[in-house]
Amino acid sequence: MDKVKKPVLTEKTIRLLEKKQYSFDVDLKSNKTEVKHWIEKFFNVEVRAMNSHRPPGKKKYAGSIVTHSVRYKRMIITLKPGYSIPLFPNE
């Protein structure tokens, strides 16, 4: 499961959990097909839709040189009815 790095838990993503939408940080070079395959195989669920976006990297200053931190890709995954992903141990 090297393409999917970690689940994202923010206020917005917790609201999306009610709609069966889960948010994950994934490898920058991965595409929707690869991530869909990994999610379906690892969690034994069926994916209905996927949306992806790349949040901007943060600037780092080293004297007069400006670099950007490592960027990542975030996927919002919508599951078919009847499926869920246990993100918390009590689920």
Swiss-Prot record:
GO terms for molecular function: rRNA binding; structural constituent of ribosome. It is found in: Plastid, Chloroplast. GO terms for biological process: translation. Gene3D superfamilies: 3.30.70.330. InterPro entries: Nucleotide-bd_a/b_plait_sf, Ribosomal_uL23-like, Ribosomal_uL23/eL15/eS24_sf, Ribosomal_uL23_CS. The keyword Ribosomal protein applies. GO terms for cellular component: chloroplast; ribonucleoprotein complex; ribosome. Keywords: Chloroplast, Plastid, Ribonucleoprotein, Ribosomal protein, RNA-binding, rRNA-binding. The keyword Chloroplast applies. SUPFAM superfamilies: Ribosomal proteins S24e, L23 and L15e (SSF54189). Part of the 50S ribosomal subunit. Binds to 23S rRNA. Belongs to the universal ribosomal protein uL23 family. This is Large ribosomal subunit protein uL23c. It comes from Huperzia lucidula (Shining clubmoss).
